[in-house]
Regions:
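Short beta-strand-to-loop capping motifs
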Residues: 34-36, 128, 178-181, 220-221
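Short loop/turn motifs enriched for small/polar and acidic residues
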Residues: 96-100, 158-160, 217-219
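N-terminal, polar/charged subdomain of small-to-medium soluble alpha/beta proteins
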Residues: 1-124, 128
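Short acidic, Gly/Ser-rich segments with clustered Asp/Glu that frequently serve as metal-coordination loops
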Residues: 14, 128-134, 219-222
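Flexible, gly/pro- and Lys/Arg-enriched active-site loops
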Residues: 37-42, 119-121, 164-171, 189, ...
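Hydrophobic C-terminal alpha-helix "anchor/cap" residues
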Residues: 79-84, 144-145, 192
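N-terminal beta1-alpha1 ligand-phosphate binding loop
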Residues: 119-150, 156-160
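Short, surface-exposed acidic-centric catalytic microdomains
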Residues: 42-54, 146-184
Length: 276
């Protein structure tokens, strides 16, 4: 990915733990590496096709002078989020804030905090088989749209499916969607749980009826196995109510562990011969 860099931008601002730091202010030095596609601007010589580093420099300065944080960690985190939300062409950013006048009582050149943040692509399966199923799903998708760190990019049609497992229950309404998000996998899972709780989801019977079920199927190309989270979602290759919506919105997306596309996984599940 291409990069545009801003190095050693000096800003006088009021951040720090000690009262004199926020009252008197001091110098901060900011560097940013912005990951984007520069080819469109390179071919057209059109500034609107790129990220204007002059405007970004002023954005950084204004942000750090209008806001006050005790910690560099908080300043750099909030600044990175603001830039990613404000600049449509910015895909990822490495941001460094230095504090050369840090009051530590010892000779040093500088202290600094550097982070890398960016947009991630996630696929989420959704389902409901209690009450007004469509309303539960509609509300959940709108709930995702209302979160500033999430952009809902594509939503499948709702699919009526038979329940999975041995518990006798009503038919499901299922689907899948693709989002861009600034959230980590764990943070995204927490947000999904909040939406489930808002729909009065009760986790009583495994594979039992539920007002709303939201599962992370994929997060970039990552493979995650923790107590709380398994990505790609466990056993999704054996669930047509997951694969059919995924084939609708991302037929050529490849499962990072199985190395088969969504289309190939569905054909395999249905007993069809895969093309070599």
């Amino acid at each position: 990915m291409d990069k545009i860099e801003i190095r050693d931008l000096e800003i006088f601002a009021n951040h720090g733990v000690f009262p004199e730091e926020t009252a008197l202010g001091q110098k901060f030095v900011v560097s940013a590496v912005m990951y984007t596609e520069t080819r469109p601007a390179g071919l057209t010589d059109d500034l609107s096709a790129s990220i204007n580093y002059g405007e970004v420099s002023h954005m950084i300065t204004d942000f750090l002078q209008k806001n006050t944080y005790k910690l560099l960690e908080a300043a750099v985190e909030n600044l990175a989020e603001t830039l990613l939300l404000s600049l449509p062409l910015l895909k990822k950013i490495t941001l460094r804030i230095e504090k050369p006048w840090a009051p530590v009582g010892l000779p040093l050149k500088t202290v600094a905090v550097e982070i890398t943040r960016g947009w991630h692509t996630a696929y989420i399966a959704f389902g409901s088989n209690m009450g007004d199923k469509k309303k539960y799903l509609d509300n959940a998708i709108q709930g995702l749209r209302d979160m500033k760190e999430i952009v809902v990019e594509k939503v499948s049609e709702y699919l009526v499916t038979e329940p999975y497992g041995d518990v006798e229950q009503d038919e499901f309404l299922n689907g899948a969607l693709r989002v861009r998000t600034l959230l980590s996998p764990e943070e995204l899972l927490d947000r999904l749980h909040v939406l489930e709780q808002a729909a009065d989801r009760k986790r009583i019977i495994h594979w039992g009826p539920r007002t709303l079920d939201l599962d992370i199927l994929f997060y970039d190309n990552e493979i995650i196995d923790t107590v709380e989270l398994h990505v790609p979602h466990i056993d999704m290759e054996n669930r047509d109510f997951v694969l059919k919506p995924m084939v609708e919105i991302a037929p050529y997306l490849r499962h990072p562990a199985l190395n088969l596309t969504m289309e190939q996984l569905l054909k395999k599940l249905e007993g069809k011969t895969l093309a070599v």
